[in-house]
UniProtKB/Swiss-Prot annotation:
Coiled coil: none annotated. Belongs to the vitamin-B12 independent methionine synthase family. The gene is metE. This is 5-methyltetrahydropteroyltriglutamate--homocysteine methyltransferase. GO terms for biological process: methionine biosynthetic process; methylation. The active site is at residue 694. SUPFAM superfamilies: UROD/MetE-like. Zn(2+) binds at residues 641, 643, 665, 726. It comes from Enterobacter sp. (strain 638). It catalyses: 5-methyltetrahydropteroyltri-L-glutamate + L-homocysteine = tetrahydropteroyltri-L-glutamate + L-methionine. Pathway: Amino-acid biosynthesis; L-methionine biosynthesis via de novo pathway; L-methionine from L-homocysteine (MetE route): step 1/1. Its EC number is 2.1.1.14. L-methionine binds at residues 431-433, 484, 599. 5-methyltetrahydropteroyltri-L-glutamate binds at residues 17-20, 117, 515-516, 561, 605.
Length: 753
């Protein structure tokens, strides 16, 4: 029983974000479809070779996606909404991009598919849409084509396929309501066809991802797995693959399935090994997800070895990443600016492949010397002064209930704020960022590289802020923002100004489509050495008589969108960040900034996957926000922003944030999300997003008015704000001006009745 290793998936974007650049070039009409496809082929070949060279035995195929892997599965199944379909029913890469970006085959605007977070990660997927009587057929052969590519290159492969039950679980019914699980028998023939094609190609194992099996699923969904897999068994060996949590609660369902192996995330389900070995059928292979695919930390391989060694020899064992390495940067070796101590604590995707090779070799030989050597920096980190700050720990320990309470209740604050700002009905604002032009990015890059001195950099940024204020005043917006020209990323910017964070040069991970982020890494206790945003906010406010919002990223979002420490709880990190940003709120207020937005778009995505674990998380998540905000006086208006959220099941917690105004993403869901606020009788003010900033489409005045009228049926008009769904950083100025002009006009029309 020789141990082999494999990965569940590998980053797609390329070390230099080649995929992003190729996508955006194609979308802009600057390159051909063949140019784009060639980049994809080159990246796949390179990534297979890199994994092989790093010691991986069984390579994943089908983990590559042009936008996201759920959208790829939708095309595989022929699930294309009517508004995006070609007249002849054909499917091509442009169909895929239309679904992701919002466009009809004619070139006319058509709503993009709804986008939401992939389980509790910072990766997004396009939500499958289901209609009654829907037909499915194999229409997009990307997986089969890529299998052919890999086989032609001589690789030992394992195709990756999103499983049918999870696919249905992730989708939404559109139009007439029905049970989407009823579509299972309709999609299974397509899966059977795909598996048959893979078997024809000599494929032995298929990794079939069913991460829904780590959730607390309704019984009817659990019951669906057995008939589904009865239909799929027999053509290839199936590795049923789960991740992001352990599987013990659903083991009875799992062990009844006719599959040949099970992959389990043993990072999150680290205590499950003995139970798995006891309850899995003896002829099943166990794929042990020992190396964390979601972080940047070097693994303690001595600990991982001890975790699995007792069952090696008792059943077939593979060692693997806990989940796809999609969520990790690609290669630590190109990071030349990290100091040696910190760098020794990290492992990116390729280094995680090396870890899997070391584990495999040690488990097969019994020789752990190399594991001990690899793990030495982990032991040293536990005592590093880079990690521990006594002053931060003391301040955190001294927090009391009073620290998370505003001076007065919302009703009292609202009166003070109305007197201070005297805003019109249907007040208009934006979420914070304005287009990051080539000029702005060049300015920041030149400054970072030392090609521009501080004075010239500041002069350049000040000019862009001034222009943003002029644009907003010309458009007639009521509450302005400074535009965030100085910020590269809403989390990275704050991390750069807080102690306890470090940054990479090339630590990019995919967020959605062509969007990549470079998360900061929390390596130690967090504190704020000096004010971060005050100077630019104060400057922007000096340019106008209208209120300018101070813009902060909230503590939970900074936590969720960073790579966190593993040696303390997430609660500890969030509250340390909250205390640092509390000082920023106080400084903004002292500088005359009367409206302060604390963005928490990640509050919901941070939820544990199992509902039974939610309360504890929400309690400390809300407390962190309140610690951050509660220092504000009554007449300082605290805003927060959330996107990609289902709110109905966390409304108590959203209300408990006690923000004076919440702006939310609603346009893609056609204001459906407001149902939650209506049913809860949410007491504070709400800005439902009136257009989708992820699409280049410019909404008409009538479209916006219709959405706002729909919102006013659910929320009293006197408590409604008018704003886009999200920040405008990724948009161009022409479409931004046009969309905001229509938004302001719609608000003015509503004021006039």
């Amino acid at each position: 029983m020789t141990v082999i290793n494999h990965t569940l998936g590998f980053p797609r974007v390329g070390l230099r974000r080649e995929l992003k650049k190729a996508q955006e070039s194609y979308w802009a009409g600057q390159s051909t479809r063949e140019d784009l496809l060639a980049v994809g082929r080159e990246l796949r070949a390179r990534h297979w070779d890199q994994q092989k060279q790093a010691g991986i035995d069984l390579l994943p195929v089908g983990d590559f996606a042009w936008y996201d892997h759920v959208l790829t599965t939708s095309l595989l199944l022929g699930n294309v909404p009517a508004r995006h379909q070609n007249k002849d029913g054909s499917v091509d890469i442009d169909t895929l991009f239309r679904l992701g970006r919002g466009r009809a085959p004619t070139g006319e605007p058509a709503a993009a598919a709804e986008m939401t977070k992939w389980f509790n990660t910072n990766y997004h997927y396009m939500v499958p849409e289901f209609v009654k009587g829907q037909q499915f057929k194999l229409t997009w052969t990307q997986l089969l084509d890529e299998v052919d590519e890999a086989l032609a290159l001589g690789h030992n492969i394992k195709p990756v396929l999103l499983g049918p039950v999870t696919y249905l679980w992730l989708g939404k019914v559109k139009g007439e309501q029905f049970d989407r699980l009823s579509l299972l028998n309709d999609i299974l023939p397509v899966y059977q066809q795909v598996l048959a094609e893979l078997a024809k190609r000599g494929v032995e194992w298929v990794q079939i991802d069913e991460p829904a099996l780590v959730l607390e699923l309704p019984q009817e969904w659990l019951d669906a797995f057995k008939p589904a897999y009865d239909a799929l068994t027999g053509q290839t060996k199936l590795l049923l693959t789960t991740y992001f949590e352990g599987v013990t609660p659903n083991l009875d369902t799992i062990t009844a399935l006719p599959v040949q192996g099970l992959h389990v995330d043993l990072v999150h389900g680290k205590d499950e090994v003995a139970e798995l070995n006891k309850r899995l059928p003896s002829d099943w292979l166990l794929s042990a997800g020992l190396v964390n695919g979601r972080n940047v930390w070097r693994a303690d391989l001595t600990e991982k070895y001890a975790q699995i060694k007792d069952i090696v020899g008792k059943r077939d064992v593979w060692v693997a990443s806990s989940c796809s390495l999609l969520h990790s940067p690609i290669d630590l070796s190109v990071e030349t600016r990290l100091d040696a101590e910190v760098k020794s604590w990290f492992a990116f995707a390729l280094q995680k492949c090396e870890e899997l090779a070391l584990l495999r070799d040690a488990l097969n030989s019994g020789d752990t010397a190399k594991l001990v050597e690899w793990s030495a920096p982990i032991q040293a980190r536990r005592h590093s002064t880079r990690v521990h700050n006594a002053a931060v720990e003391k301040r955190l320990a001294a927090i009391t209930a009073k620290d998370s309470q505003r001076e007065n209740a919302y009703e009292v604050r609202a009166e003070a704020q109305r007197a201070r700002f005297n805003l019109p009905a249907w007040p208009t604002t934006t979420i914070g960022s304005f287009p990051q032009t080539t000029e702005i990015r060049g300015l920041r890059l030149d400054f970072k590289k030392g090609n521009l001195d501080a004075n010239n950099y500041r002069t350049g940024i000040a000019e862009h802020i001034k222009q943003a204020i002029i644009e907003q005043e010309r458009l007639g917006l009521d509450v302005l923002v400074h535009g965030e020209a100085e910020r590269n990323d809403m989390v990275e910017y704050f991390g750069e100004h807080l102690d306890g964070f470090v940054f990479t040069q090339n630590g990019w991970v995919q967020s959605y489509g062509s969007r990549c982020v470079k998360p900061p890494v929390v390596i130690g206790d967090v504190s704020r050495p000096e004010a971060i945003t005050v100077e630019w906010a104060k400057y922007a406010q000096s340019l106008t008589d209208k209120p300018v919002k101070g813009m902060l990223t909230g503590p939970v979002t900074i936590l969720c969108w960073s790579f966190p420490r593993e040696d303390v709880t997430r609660e500890t990190i969030a509250k340390q960040i909250a205390l640092a940003l509390r000082d920023e709120v106080a400084d903004l207020e002292a500088a005359g900034i009367g409206i302060i937005q604390i963005d928490e778009p990640a509050l919901r995505e941070g939820l544990p996957l199992r509902r039974s674990d939610w309360d504890a998380y929400l309690q400390w998540g809300v407390e962190a926000f309140r610690i951050n905000a509660a220092v504000a006086k009554n007449d300082t208006q605290i805003h927060t922003h959330m996107c990609y959220c289902e709110f109905n099941d966390i409304m108590d917690s959203i209300a408990a944030l006690d923000a004076d105004v919440i702006t939310i993403e609603t346009s893609r869901s056609d204001m459906e999300l407001l149902e939650s606020f209506e049913e809860f009788d949410y007491p504070n003010e709400i800005g439902p997003g009136v257009y989708d900033i992820h699409s280049p489409n410019v909404p008409s005045v009538e479209w916006i008015e219709a959405l706002l009228a729909k919102a006013a049926q659910r929320i009293p008009a006197e408590r409604l704000w008018v704003n886009p769904d999200c920040g405008l950083k990724t948009r161009g100025w022409p479409e931004t001006r046009a969309a905001l002009a229509n938004m302001v006009k719609a608000a003015q029309n509503l004021r006039q009745g």
